[in-house]
Amino acid sequence: MPHSYDYDAIVIGSGPGGEGAAMGLVKQGARVAVIERYQNVGGGCTHWGTIPSKALRHAVSRIIEFNQNPLYSDHSRLLRSSFADILNHADNVINQQTRMRQGFYERNHCEILQGNARFVDEHTLVLDCPDGSVETLTAEKFVIACGSRPYHPTDVDFTHPRIYDSDSILSMHHEPRHVLIYGAGVIGCEYASIFRGMDVKVDLINTRDRLLAFLDQEMSDSLSYHFWNSGVVIRHNEEYEKIEGCDDGVIMHLKSGKKLKADCLLYANGRTGNTDSLALQNIGLETDSRGQLKVNSMYQTAQPHVYAVGDVIGYPSLASAAYDQGRIAAQALVKGEATAHLIEDIPTGIYTIPEISSVGKTEQQLTAMKVPYEVGRAQFKHLARAQIVGMNVGTLKILFHRETKEILGIHCFGERAAEIIHIGQAIMEQKGGGNTIEYFVNTTFNYPTMAEAYRVAALNGLNRLF
């Protein structure tokens, strides 16, 4: 006689990964419950990560645009906003996103349970509810989508009012004039842009020898130059020895012997999976040192009835990929296998000011692979649309095979880069000879548009062939 469970599947976490899994499961007729630790759905992406930081970035970039536009501004009338004012804009966006996502679950009759989950045995969870009560839930299968949080080294006092991580920075109430950012990854670079855009002095401490080393080197160099030009001080190959919190700021002692002082510190060096409270040892699962789980191509853990998606499995740690992972895991969970798979070339969007976005191979990778590629470039300053809106900083670079004309990689630096990249991505994904740089020469673009950069870059690249 088959065992009777409360649910076919329980999803732990309501971020993009959990939402993708839950929606995929209910659409296939499964009885599903989603457990969310906090009062509102959406996870770290909606409340502390992607959404608030991008809303912040947008507000700051519009202020910069206004102040740099000679039509609207003069030296006696600069537009200024406090950090608190800009955070209010982010709060409005978060509330809209939360209401929308809550509606998804309600429309699809997907039960949301609030509390902290922990495993008792292979098919049983205990839920510690906010009112102090404890519920026991059973399910045939589970999806762990509990996300990640900023990594906290034990020798840094994050309770100090001037020491922030990428979550707590969103509750900053004072107006810093000088910020130290430790960690020059995506989050560190994005916040360096935001603070510098608000006229705050920024020291960016990079533990490596260049910014965002996974990017094409020209894109990384462009960001470094732009930071240098705007006044961000970057210190490469540095690690902290000691961090001291004072009444009026923070002092950082570096292993190289340097000392830095600023009004506050944003520690943005690494993230760790939210798995420590799940009691995974009770179901025979182990995490790595970063609290992450290993999974196979169908997102199954070492326990075949337990799946994991999103930040908790590490790379690529993108909201966009997490949603797709959840959808694929839901298919595998119900049908035993998944016909869908994550695409090979996942686009990267980095929301610095200006943006950076890329898809496919870098020049360095193609050179190492000995692929005979050629480069096509378009500078934004030569596009009519960019001239009209004053977006002169930026470039689009297309890498293509010089013999087959196949597009191998696209890299964009400049405003709207994360939108522009998808035009090229759509052509790269075409099968049966459809992936060719000649498409951009043979198609008609609206004029004037930023998309026209593809035609300019394609002509530039094809003109290099002989």
UniProtKB/Swiss-Prot annotation:
It comes from the Bacteria. It catalyses: NAD(+) + NADPH = NADH + NADP(+). Keywords: Cytoplasm, FAD, Flavoprotein, NAD, NADP, Oxidoreductase. FAD binds at E36, R37, Y38, Q39, N40, V41, G42, G43, G44, C45. InterPro entries: Class-I_Pyr_Nuc-Dis_Oxidored (IPR050151), FAD/NAD-bd_sf (IPR036188), FAD/NAD-binding_dom (IPR023753), FAD/NAD-linked_Rdtase_dimer_sf (IPR016156), Pyr_nuc-diS_OxRdtase (IPR001100), Pyr_nucl-diS_OxRdtase_dimer (IPR004099), STH_gammaproteobact (IPR022962). Binds 1 FAD per subunit. GO terms for molecular function: dihydrolipoyl dehydrogenase (NADH) activity; flavin adenine dinucleotide binding; NAD(P)+ transhydrogenase (Si-specific) activity. GO terms for biological process: 2-oxoglutarate metabolic process; NADP metabolic process. Its cofactor is FAD. The keyword DNA damage does not apply. One of its GO terms (cellular component) is cytosol. Pfam families: Pyr_redox_2 (PF07992), Pyr_redox_dim (PF02852). It is found in: Cytoplasm. Its EC number is 1.6.1.1. Conversion of NADPH, generated by peripheral catabolic pathways, to NADH, which can enter the respiratory chain for energy generation. Belongs to the class-I pyridine nucleotide-disulfide oxidoreductase family. This is Soluble pyridine nucleotide transhydrogenase. It comes from Shigella boydii serotype 18 (strain CDC 3083-94 / BS512). The lineage of its organism: Bacteria, Pseudomonadati, Pseudomonadota, Gammaproteobacteria, Enterobacterales.
